[in-house]
UniProtKB/Swiss-Prot annotation:
Belongs to the thymidylate kinase family. The keyword Kinase applies. ATP binds at G13, L14, E15, G16, A17, G18, K19, S20. This is Thymidylate kinase. It comes from Shewanella sp. (strain MR-4). GO terms for molecular function: ATP binding; dTMP kinase activity. It is an enzyme of class 2 (transferase). Coiled coil: none annotated.
Length: 209
């Protein structure tokens, strides 16, 4: 595989959309077609510092509630670390990168869900400077169904405990942004896992390998 062929692919979706199984599928597909396992990342997280920030964002502290603006800025601090120290170096070495969430999550959750789009766009522009994935697969699912699925996994984290209208706004933002960007592909995550995986593979197989 040549350096020029390396790609950054991201899986996005609301809680319970099936990102983990989709990522496992894509990871195996990339390894089969390139002979190399991709560098897998998650957001927030993916570096020692970013993982500590993840805990601040995901774990509620009733004694010092995280305000929406702080949440947004912390997530971008983690993302800046990940992009600078993991994603860009991997791509420069010709390695494929597979991300569990990226900037689209902030646009949907903090921009749409929290109503902070001007702040999100400003911080995104300042930290990422136009850097974006080559392909984003957005697993679309009704928030009510997604939260039901998430609850079956165990205790919900701070983000997962938000009111349903937060997730409805986030979903609407995801879909709006997907309609404006051909590099974002919407996958119907209400289907069976087999059907979802079939749709994902169809997208991957259409790429130049």
């Amino acid at each position: 595989m040549t350096q020029a062929s390396a790609k950054f692919i991201v899986v996005e979706g609301l809680e319970g959309a099936g990102k983990s199984s989709a990522i496992a599928l894509i990871r195996d597909f990339i390894e089969k077609h390139t002979g190399l396992a991709p560098v897998c990342t998650r957001e927030p997280g993916g570096t020692p510092l970013a993982e500590r920030i993840r805990d601040l964002v995901k774990i509620a502290d009733p004694s010092d509630p995280l305000c929406d603006e702080s949440e947004c800025l912390l997530i971008y601090a983690a993302r800046a670390q990940l992009v600078a120290n993991v994603i860009k170096p991997a791509l420069a070495e010709g390695k494929w990168v597979l991300g569990d969430r990226h900037n689209l999550s902030s646009l949907a959750y903090q921009g749409g869900g929290r109503g902070l789009m001007p702040l999100v766009e400003a911080v995104s522009n300042a930290t990422l400077k136009g850097f974006k994935p080559d392909l984003t697969l957005y697993l679309d699912l009704d928030p009510k169904l997604g939260l039901q699925r998430a609850a079956k996994r165990g205790e919900l984290d701070r983000i997962e405990q938000q009111a349903i209208d937060f997730f409805e706004r986030a979903r609407a933002t995801y879909l709006k942004l997907a309609s404006e960007d051909e590099q974002i592909v919407v996958i119907d995550a209400s289907q069976t896992m087999a059907e979802v995986h079939k749709d994902i593979l169809a997208v991957l197989q259409a790429m130049a390998w």
